[in-house]
Structure formats: structure tokens, C-alpha cells
Swiss-Prot record:
Pfam families: MYT1 (PF08474), zf-C2HC (PF01530). A zinc finger (CCHHC-type) spans 22-65, 496-539, 540-583, 895-938, 944-987, 997-1040. The gene is Myt1l. It comes from Rattus norvegicus (Rat). One of its GO terms (molecular function) is cobalt ion binding. Brain, testis and pituitary gland. Expression is higher in the brain than in the testis and pituitary gland. Highest level expression seen in the developing CNS. This is Myelin transcription factor 1-like protein. Zn(2+) 6 binds at residues 1006, 1011, 1024, 1030.
Length: 1187
């Protein structure tokens, strides 16, 4: 039987390649799964798939319905010949049991046989069967030629090609093949006649259909085991023996649409000759097919071969691959079942099927004595096996008892069968051929799928082998429980590969190509699918709920490595990163204080302010800055955000030891600043430090500007942070606690520098009375202290008011240990009176706290640039809010007055293609691919959101060429301007100050601490001047979730500061002038356009006039010609007198012509001789007129 299987497998493959599919069977190539629209097929880029093998819906349903089961060993035939009675008993018992019972019987019945059989016999028999394959194909070719089947004639050519490939193997067992051929002549004599009988043709074609499905399943099984590199192989001589073993571990989908459609087609075929099949044919077909196979296994006992136990172990891993072949298995069984039904009906009308059975048994009994276990059979055994199935007597009677009667019936049956018409024969043969072709193509496609999945499985197994050696154990450790199976290639849908299931795009109709995020043929989410617009709303809603960041409170914005609207992991979540850094900060609370002193002072540097150019300050010599490159910014921030600070244990009413920040070198500027250097905030406690989350570079509550000011001079400089309650509240809403700086506020004002403490120990504390605390770790209770806040806990306005109300003095050495925020510098009056202390009860958190220490001439919003040169790093006006760039970005963006999204300001830009990042939207024109090269964009200013501002380089005389940082025609800052760099270099060489822009530019800095001015929504300058469009302020405000009243207060403070700042007012006036200039330019453009329109209209009018003149000339010429013709006609007809009319003249010319026209039109009325003569005269007179 293996020869039959091998030959049919070769021929099936050739059919799939060579036989064209006719349009009539194209409908077979759509997915049969109910509810499947053809999308998500794992095997390729087709809009529709043709089977349930690669259908994701069918795969999912089978996985859910499939119950885990123990691997069942294959059914093994006995190695001894069984008599007819045992065959009958086996059939009857198996036919009455269900699938599960048969699996158990197989386990018990053949377990010993499997242990006793050897591996060597399997290998030898498989080799001999493969070598004898070509000889047997020749026998089939003879039979096919007699049948006259065109399709099988094409298959003969394929068999000849394969015969050349196996010519050497064929010669080794040539003698054995010849012996087999000598023993089969009577079978050939009985079956080489043409199939004139209709039912015999149906039986033959149905056998081919069943064999095609059976061979496809067998080939998948054989190739899978050959890839496992084991010394064991399946038996090739009986495919149905193998199918029995496989069915014990397959969960067959008898309700599959493939099976259902095929059975429907066969039912229609059966109805053509009066056979009615039951509706549950699909349910019965499997059990009957199993029982029939059991019967054949018992009859053909010489065909059996031992089975290896190693294969049974591997069947567990390969069972999933065979699940996809269950439909073909069912198809084969149903074909046999249909053939049997045909045979049960036909004996009533014709005696052919019983006769076939009789001939079968005669030949069978004759052939059995001469067979050996390694005997192979030609394709004629296919018909014999089918005849055995068709005959019910072969299952109920002994073949020996029926032998004589069968001989007597041969001739009669043949004569009856020859009466079938040739036309019905050809039609049926064509229909069955189409079905065979369709199944052949499906089998070939399934084979290609399995080969591809086997290659993928091999690569994954190689990766898994490395993981097995690593100490980290994966969740699926059961995949490597068997060491002998570590090298076996697992199928793509192996149950252990749970992470690979459903790895396809859920978009209907998407084949996996064009996914924006990866290099994989299939994508597993909707986020990057190019066909996302096809997704139904319910599916989209489901995925939107699933594919979200697991961080609580995260909306998906700001993910560091994704351009999706939502991120699905913590790896790139800014909030998760902030919490992680906060936890890391808490681990270092027990570190030594000296570690903080050893930290680099670069923590205080304005790392985010990478574009700011050094600006000379009122005649003082510039200090060359050391800027931090943007490329190293993230690393340095991460490095310095891990600075350790020491805390002692404390409670809500005690103070711990104050952490010391790295020193900042400053320079004495004025006596006023010197005097003010005495005052610091009283609340130098960990509780206040932990709340300054986003002010690592600021020593005060001033984490963000807006109605605040400060002065910073030298080591004896002073800092006034009284008016920064607004900033303190924003700092309290921070996520991180990357800074443990002290918030210090002035309390006692003095004009004498001697009031400073004489001790310089930076670790000493000073109480409100000016007494030094010489104890390093001493804790003092403070009744007025606010409760301790955690790093992630927002501080209430009342708490911040209390913190900023109590002040005390620190030693002179502490001046060097405080980080200075140079964005809030302002002059202080020496003779100001001391501020009063406030309590949370009589304090409006924003209003009074911000106004309490406002003095005459004081500005509530800081000067964007310091009015005095403070230190050698004064050119770095802006300082980062924290060491985390993500935290800075988030906290600042929340403080904007408007809630607009941080999107690119370029009109029509959706945020894609931005040069500088992976974000869903970009916030500036610097990397926008759609930014206009002309340098004009819409700017949203405070006064008029529709005003336009140029985005040109601010350096005077620069035309935008040669900018080092961009590819655009105009640049917006002097950081990369070659002209500015050249002038600055010349200024240094000549000793003169370099000013690339007027001093008014100094005021154009954002009041948000740490903001470098980039990404401002409403400005086109390097720095922005208010909180209204600051992305960092917007982000912080969103996180703080401030109420409307608080937001209004902040906006009022910001607006008040802008109104009171003369430089800002000057800038606003200039902006108004620019707006007026722009308006004038727009008016000029409108005028110009109007002039152009008028000119165009005038030219059109002239053209129309010229055309009219031409028309008039033509009309005049036509009138002249008409007058000439009239005169000629009058002259010619002057001598002709019409009845009842005067001679022709100019007065009666029209009437005369009308009469003539009527006469010639109605000549029937003028048939008299006189009228005819008149008409003839008129013709002669008019003949001489030239038109």
C-alpha cells in the first residue's frame, strides 16, 4: 500500500503545480470558516484564504475547544496473518465504539507490539518501498492510459520525471519489483478495461479524492518526522494505518467548512444516481472510516510494520501541526463513506458492486499466500480496497465462503455495467477531476505552509536552546522537559508557544504588510496598521482599552520610544520612570552627607538651556561658559539625578539634618546684594526638601516663575523667594524628588554684613534667634512645621505658605552650598521693612503669599535676564527643574495657561516625520518636515493669536544661510548662526563686546525654571516670555490638576508681572509695531492683488472689444455681399412678371423673394404650361448670378 500512497503523493504535488485551476472552482478558494472575511491568514498576502489551516478564527476556536489529552500510540497491524473471522470481529467491535474508545483500545492492544518491534526493520522497509515506487507507478500509468483520463495522463509525465531522480534506487530492488509484477497479472486483466460503468467510475474518482486527502496528511506527518533527525520513521506501505494512529491524537473538526462544502459537493454528485445521504454523514464518516481501516489493517496483515516508541513521544509535540490537517482526514473518510453508500444503493439496480467485491476477495485470497512482510503493491490495490469497502458482504461474511459465488458473477456484472452511456461517463469524470484538482492545489499550498513554519520553528528552537542554558527560567519550562526532544522542530502553533498565538494584525483585510513599527510580516496591534481605518468601532475600542500603558494615571503621551497614542509597557513611560527614580532616591537616604558634597556642581548648570548664547552684562567681562551638549544631556541628567543626600529619621514636627547642595561660584556685585545675603528660609527640613521635586537646581520654592523675583550676588549674596508661592505649589506637584535642596526665605532684614553667622561649617543649622546648632544630628521639634510630604505627594498652598513664612539665618559658608536660580534675579531695597509672619488661617494661598513681601519698586515677575552679572555662569539663565528630562518636560507642560495639545505649530502637520524624536506630535518648527522654507508661520501671541511673526535668524544681517543646525532657509536663533559665531570671535580678538542682538532680547526668556525656550507654542524666538505657551508649564499644570480659581490666580500673577516689567512692556510695544507693520504689508498685498485683478479685467475687456470689432467687420462684409446679391437678383428678374405682383424692385424685394420661394417649394400647384414656362424663365434669369 505504500506504493499507492507514494505514487499518489507525487502525482498530487505535480497536479498542484501543473494543472490550472478553472474558474468554476474558484469559490473553493475562499475561507470556509463562518464569520471569516479572509483577513489575518498566516500563510500570505492574499485577501482571502482557502482553508481553515491558516484561518485565525478557526485556530482560535480549536484552541479554546481542544482539551489536553495524552498522546496515543499509533495503531500497529499484527505481524501475523489474521483469518477472516477475526477480521469480522474486529470490524464489528470497532464500528460500534466512538473515537475515544478506539484510542484506548489502540493503547492497550498495541503497546506490547510497539515495544517488540525494532527500529531497523522500519528503516529497511521504508527504503525498499521508496525504491520500488517508480516500478509501481508504471503499473498505474498503464491503467490510467486505458481509462483515458486526461488528468492522469498529465500525471504520468510527472511520474517519469521522478523516475529519473530515483533511478539508482530502483535498480537495487528491481528483482523484487519484477516478482511483484509477475504475481499481479490477473488483477491487471480484470481492471484494465475502460470504465464504461458509471458507478465504477464514481468509485474510482472517490478513491482518488480520499487518497489525495489521505496523502496530504501522511506527507505532513512524514516530513515532520524527517526533520526531527530521529532514526525512526513512519510506515509508508499503509497510509490508512498511519491515519488511524494519527486520529487517536488529533482533535478533528468534523464541522469544518472545508469538510462541509466537500460533502455537499459529493452529495450533489450522489443525487445524480439516486443515492440519498444522511445529514449526519460528517459525524458518521469518521467512525466508519476508522472501522473500515481497522478491517483493512486486519486483512492486509502483511502490510503492517512495527512502530517506534520514540515517534509516539514526539507525536505530542507535533499534534498541533496535524490539527490543521483534520479537515483533509475527514474528507477522505467521507469520500469512502459516500462510496459505500453508493454501493449499498446500487445493488438494487445493478449487480456490479457485489461483483467487484467478489472479484476482490478472489484476488485477495489468491494473493495472500505469496506475500511477504516487505511486499509492495501497485496502484491497482486502490481499486481492490475500494471494492472491499463498497461490498457490505466483505464485512459480514467470510471471504472463503464467498469465493465460488464471486467467480460465477463476473461476466454478468460486466455486461450490465457496459450499458452506461458514454456522455454520463464523461460528465461525471470531469466533475470529479475538478474536485481532485482543487484538493490537489490545497494540499500543495498546505505543504508550502508547513515547510515555512518548520523553518521558523527551527530558528526559534535554536534561540530557546540558549535560553535553556541561562539561569533565568521562562514561564514555559515544560517545553524543555524532554532532553531528547530539544532538537525537534516544533510547529508554529505548538501549544507551548503561547506567545506566538494570534500574532497577526486584527485589522480586517490586512495581510501584515506595511506595518509602521516593525520588520515582521505580521503585526499584532492596530496602532501601526496602515489599514487602521478599516477597523470596526467595536474592535478599535477593544484594542484601545487593551493597548494602554499600565501606569496608573498615564494617558499614553510622552512615551520615549513610541509614536503611538498609547504605550503598552512601563519601559518608556515617563511617569513610571519618574517613580522609579524616586524609589532609587529613597534608597540613598542613609548615605553619608559627604557624598553630596562630592557631587559635581554641574547639577546646577542649566543643562536644558543648550541654545542660550552668552550675553555680556552691563560692561562686565564675559565668562566663557561650559555648555552641556544636547547629545549628552540625558546621560548627565541621569547621572546627577542619582546624587545621594542624607536624611535622619524625622516626624511631622522635627527637623533632620539639612542636606548640602554643591557649591555655585558667584561674584559680589553690590552692597545691597551683600546685605541681603543673610536671609534664608527657615524651613530647611527634609519635609520641605522632598517637596521641591522639580527644583533640583533651585534653592527656593521658585521652581517656576510668574510673579516672583530673587537676587543673587556672590558668596554673600541674598535670595528673596518670598513671592514664589506659586512656584512652590508647582514644585509640590512634582513626580520626582531628585533634589534635596533647602527652601529658604528671608526673615530678618539687616544692612550689615556682620549679621551673618561667623561659623562657616556648612552642616550647621541656625535657629530663628541666630544661634548656631553645633550638633550635627540633633533634632529639634518645630511646632510651626508643616507635615512631611512624600516625593509624590502634592503640597497644599497652606503648607507652602507656612513653609515660606518662617525664616532664619545660615552661616556664610552656606551661601556657597545653595543652588542659585538666576532667572529670578532682581534688585532689593536695603531699607525695606521686615515682612510679617503669616499663618494659614489668614492667608490666601496664592494672593497673600505672593503679595506679602512686595516692596516699592519691586517687580513680581522676574527679569528674564539678571540685571546684574551674578557669576561666571550667569549666561546660563535657565536651570532644569530636575535631573530627568522626561520629568522636566511633563511638569513644565502642565503649567501652561491653555490646555492645548503639544502639537507642531505648523499648519496641517500631524506630527509625523519629525527629525528629532519619536513622539506622536512635535512642538516646534525646528524639526518639522512641513515647515515652510520661507520662514513665515502663524504665531499665537497674547494679544492676537492670528498675528504672524518671522522665524528668521535674530542676528542682524543674517539671511539664514549656513545655519549649522538645520536644513531650512531661515534659522531662528544665534546658536548655530555662522555670522554670530564670526562676530563673537572677532569681539574676543579685538577686546570689544559682541552683541548679536539688542539688549531687549535679554528679556525674552521663559519664566519657567529650567526652560530653554524650545517648543513654545506661541513664539518663534529662542526663548519665550510667558507661561502661556510654555510646554513644560503646561505639563506640570496638568499633573497638578489645579482648580479653575488657582489657574486664574496664576494667570493673573503672570499678567501682572508682564505689565510691571518695563522691558517686557518695551517688547510688547515692539511686537505691536511688528504687528502693525505686518498689517500694513498685508494691506499692501491686498492692494497689489486688487491692482493685478483690475489689470487682468482690463486686458480681458480689451480682448473682448477686439473680438467684437472683428465680428462687426464680418457682419459688414456679409451685409455688403447681401446687398450685391439683392441688386443682382433684382436686375436679373426685372423682365419677369409674376402673377398678381408688380415688377421686382427694392421695395417689394422681400415679398418677391418669398413668392419665388413658395413657387419652387410647391411646384405641384404650378403644373400649368404658363407656370412651368414662368419657372423656367426664372431659372434662366437667375443662372447667371454669382454667389
Amino acid at each position: 500500500m505504500d506504493v499507492d500512497a507514494e505514487e499518489k503523493r507525487h502525482r498530487t504535488r505535480s497536479k498542484g503545480v501543473r494543472v490550472p485551476v478553472e474558474p468554476a472552482i474558484q469559490e473553493l478558494f475562499s475561507c470556509p470558516t463562518p464569520g471569516c472575511d479572509g483577513s489575518g491568514h498566516v500563510s500570505g498576502k492574499y485577501a482571502r484564504h482557502r482553508s481553515v489551516y491558516g484561518c485565525p478564527l478557526a485556530k482560535k476556536r480549536k484552541t479554546q475547544d481542544k482539551q489536553p489529552q495524552e498522546p496515543a500510540p499509533k495503531r500497529k497491524p499484527f505481524a501475523v496473518k489474521a483469518d477472516s473471522s477475526s477480521v469480522d470481529e474486529c470490524y464489528e467491535s470497532d464500528g460500534t465504539e466512538d473515537m475515544d474508545d478506539k484510542e484506548e483500545d489502540d493503547d492497550e492492544e498495541f503497546s506490547e507490539d510497539n515495544d517488540e518491534q525494532g527500529d531497523d526493520d522500519d528503516e529497511d522497509e521504508v527504503d525498499r518501498e521508496d525504491e520500488e515506487e517508480i516500478e509501481e507507478e508504471d503499473d498505474e500509468d498503464d491503467e490510467d492510459d486505458d481509462d483515458g483520463d486526461d488528468v492522469e495522463e498529465e500525471e504520468d509525465d510527472d511520474d517519469e520525471e521522478e523516475e529519473e531522480e530515483e533511478e539508482e534506487e530502483e535498480n537495487e530492488d528491481h528483482q523484487m519489483s519484477c516478482t511483484r509484477i509477475m504475481q499481479d497479472p490477473e488483477k491487471d486483466d480484470n481492471n484494465n478495461d475502460e470504465y464504461d460503468n458509471y458507478d465504477e467510475l464514481v468509485a474510482k474518482s472517490l478513491l482518488n479524492l480520499g487518497k489525495i486527502a489521505e496523502d496530504a496528511a501522511y506527507r505532513a506527518r512524514t516530513e515532520s518526522e524527517m526533520n526531527s533527525n530521529t532514526s525512526n520513521s513512519l510506515e509508508d506501505d499503509s497510509d490508512k494505518n498511519e491515519n488511524l494512529g494519527r486520529k487517536s491524537e488529533l482533535s478533528l473538526d468534523l464541522d469544518s467548512d472545508v469538510v462541509r462544502e466537500t460533502v455537499d459537493s459529493l452529495k450533489l454528485l450522489a443525487q445524480g444516481h439516486g443515492v440519498v445521504l444522511s445529514e449526519n454523514i460528517s459525524d458518521r464518516s469518521y467512525a466508519e472510516g476508522m472501522s473500515q481501516q481497522d478491517s483493512r489493517n486486519m486483512n492486509y496483515v502483511m502490510l503492517g510494520k512495527p512502530m517506534n516508541n520514540g515517534l509516539m513521544e514526539k507525536m505530542v509535540e507535533e499534534s498541533d501541526e496535524e490539527v490543521c490537517l483534520s479537515s483533509l482526514e475527514c474528507l477522505r473518510n467521507q469520500c469512502f463513506d459516500l462510496a459505500r453508500k453508493l454501493s449499498e444503493t446500487n445493488p438494487q439496480d445493478r449487480s456490479q458492486p457485489p461483483n467487484m467485491s467478489v472479484r476482490q476477495h478472489v484476488r485477495q485470497e489468491d494473493d495472500f499466500p505469496g506475500r511477504t512482510p516487505d511486499r509492495s503493491y501497485s496502484d491497482m490495490m486502490n481499486l481492490m480496497r475500494l471494492e472491499e469497502q463498497l461490498s457490505p458482504r466483505s464485512r459480514t461474511f467470510s471471504s472463503c465462503a464467498k469465493e465460488d459465488g464471486c467467480h460465477e458473477r463476473d461476466d454478468d456484472t460486466t455486461s450490465v455495467n457496459s450499458d452506461r452511456s458514454e456522455e454520463v461517463f464523461d460528465m461525471t469524470k470531469g466533475n470529479l477531476t475538478l474536485l481532485e484538482k482543487a484538493i490537489a492545489l490545497e494540499t500543495e499550498r498546505a505543504k508550502a505552509m508547513r515547510e515555512k513554519m518548520a523553518m521558523d520553528a527551527g530558528r526559534r528552537d535554536n534561540l530557546r536552546s540558549y535560553e535553556d542554558q541561562s539561569p533565568r527560567q521562562l514561564a514555559g519550562e515544560d517545553r524543555k522537559s524532554k532532553s531528547s526532544d530539544s532538537h525537534v522542530k516544533k510547529p508554529y502553533y505548538d501549544p507551548s508557544r503561547t506567545e506566538k498565538r494570534e500574532s497577526k494584525c486584527p485589522t480586517p483585510g490586512c495581510d501584515g504588510t506595511g506595518h509602521v513599527t516593525g520588520l515582521y510580516p505580521h503585526h499584532r496591534s492596530l496602532s501601526g496598521c496602515p489599514h487602521k481605518d478599516r477597523v470596526p468601532p467595536e474592535i478599535l475600542a477593544m484594542h484601545e482599552n487593551v493597548l494602554k500603558c499600565p501606569t496608573p494615571g498615564c494617558t499614553g503621551r510622552g512615551h520615549v520610544n513610541s509614536n503611538r497614542n498609547s504605550h503598552r509597557s512601563l519601559s518608556g513611560c515617563p511617569i513610571a520612570a519618574a517613580e522609579k527614580l524616586a524609589k532609587a532616591q529613597e534608597k540613598h537616604q542613609s548615605c553619608d552627607v559627604s557624598k553630596s558634597n562630592q557631587a559635581s556642581d554641574r547639577v546646577l548648570r542649566p543643562m536644558c538651556f543648550v541654545k542660550q548664547l552668552e550675553i555680556p552684562q552691563y560692561g562686565y567681562r564675559n565668562n566663557v561658559p561650559t555648555t552641556t551638549p544636547r547629545s549628552n544631556l540625558a546621560k548627565e541628567l541621569e547621572k546627577y539625578s542619582k546624587t545621594s543626600f542624607e536624611y535622619n529619621s524625622y516626624d511631622n514636627h522635627t527637623y533632620g539634618k539639612r542636606a548640602i547642595a554643591p557649591k555655585v561660584q558667584t561674584r559680589d556685585i553690590s552692597p545691597k546684594g551683600y546685605d541681603d545675603a543673610k536671609r534664608y528660609c527657615k524651613n530647611a527640613s527634609p519635609s520641605s526638601s522632598t517637596t521641591s521635586s522639580y527644583a533640583p537646581s533651585s534653592s527656593s520654592n521658585l521652581s517656576c516663575g510668574g510673579g516672583s523675583s530673587a537676587s543673587s550676588t556672590c558668596s554673600k549674596s541674598s535670595f528673596d523667594y518670598t513671592h514664589d508661592m506659586e512656584a512652590a505649589h508647582m514644585a509640590a506637584t512634582a513626580i520626582l524628588n531628585l533634589s534635596t535642596r533647602c527652601r529658604e526665605m528671608p526673615q530678618n532684614l539687616s544692612t550689615k554684613p556682620q549679621d551673618l553667622c561667623t561659623a562657616r561649617n556648612p552642616d550647621m543649622e541656625v535657629d530663628e534667634n541666630g544661634t548656631l546648632d553645633l550638633s550635627m544630628n540633633k533634632q529639634r521639634p518645630r511646632d510651626s512645621c508643616c507635615p512631611v510630604l512624600t516625593p509624590l505627594e502634592p503640597m497644599s498652598p497652606q503648607q507652602q505658605a507656612v513653609m515660606s513664612s518662617r525664616c532664619f539665618q545660615l552661616s556664610e559658608g552656606d551661601c556657597w552650598d545653595l543652588p542659585v536660580d538666576y532667572t529670578k534675579m532682581k534688585p532689593r531695597r536695603v531699607d525695606e521693612e521686615d515682612p510679617k509672619e503669616i499663618t494659614p488661617e489668614d492667608l490666601d494661598p496664592f494672593q497673600e503669599a505672593l503679595e506679602e513681601r512686595r516692596y516699592p519698586g519691586e517687580v513680581t515677575i522676574p527679569s528674564p535676564k539678571p540685571k546684574y552679572p551674578q557669576c561666571k555662569e550667569s549666561k546660563k539663565d535657565l536651570i532644569t527643574l530636575s535631573g530627568c528630562p522626561l520629568a522636566d518636560k511633563s511638569i513644565r507642560s502642565m503649567l501652561a495657561t491653555s490646555s492645548q495639545e503639544l502639537k507642531c505649530p505648523t499648519p496641517g502637520c500631524d506630527g509625523s516625520g519629525h527629525i528629532t524624536g519619536n513622539y506622536a506630535s512635535h512642538r516646534s518648527l525646528s524639526g518639522c518636515p512641513r515647515a515652510k522654507k520661507s520662514g513665515i508661520r502663524i504665531a499665537q501671541s497674547k494679544e492676537d493669536k492670528e498675528d504672524q511673526e518671522p522665524i528668521r535668524c535674530p542676528v542682524p544681517g543674517c539671511d539664514g544661510q549656513g545655519h549649522i543646525t538645520g536644513k531650512y532657509a531661515s534659522h531662528r536663533s544665534a546658536s548655530g548662526c555662522p555670522l554670530a559665531a564670526k562676530r563673537q570671535k572677532d569681539g574676543y580678538l579685538n577686546g570689544s563686546q559682541f552683541s548679536w542682538k539688542s539688549v531687549k532680547t535679554e528679556g525674552m526668556s521663559c519664566p519657567t525654571p529650567g526652560c530653554d525656550g524650545s517648543g513654545h507654542v506661541s513664539g518663534s524666538f529662542l526663548t519665550h516670555r510667558s507661561l502661556s505657551g510654555c510646554p513644560r508649564a503646561t505639563s506640570a499644570m496638568k499633573k497638578a490638576k489645579l482648580s479653575g480659581e488657582q489657574m486664574l490666580t496664576i494667570k493673573q500673577r503672570a499678567s501682572n508681572g508682564i505689565e510691571n516689567d518695563e522691558e517686557i512692556k518695551q517688547l510688547d510695544e515692539e511686537i505691536k509695531e511688528l504687528n502693525e507693520s505686518n498689517s500694513q504689508m498685508e494691506a499692501d498685498m491686498i492692494k497689489l492683488r486688487t491692482q493685478v485683478t483690475i489689470t487682468t479685467m482690463e486686458s480681458n475687456l480689451k480682448t473682448i472689444e477686439e473680438e467684437n470689432k472683428v465680428i462687426e467687420q464680418q457682419n459688414e462684409s456679409l451685409l455688403h455681399e447681401l446687398a450685391n446679391l439683392s441688386q443682382s437678383l433684382i436686375h436679373s428678374l426685372a423682365n419677369i412678371q409674376l402673377p398678381h405682383m408688380d415688377p421686382i424692385n427694392e421695395q417689394n424685394f422681400d415679398a418677391y423673394v418669398t413668392t419665388l420661394t413658395e413657387m419652387y417649394t410647391n411646384q405641384d400647384r404650378y403644373q400649368s404650361p404658363e407656370n412651368k414656362a414662368l419657372l423656367e424663365n426664372i431659372k434662366q434669369a437667375v443662372r447667371g448670378i454669382q454667389v
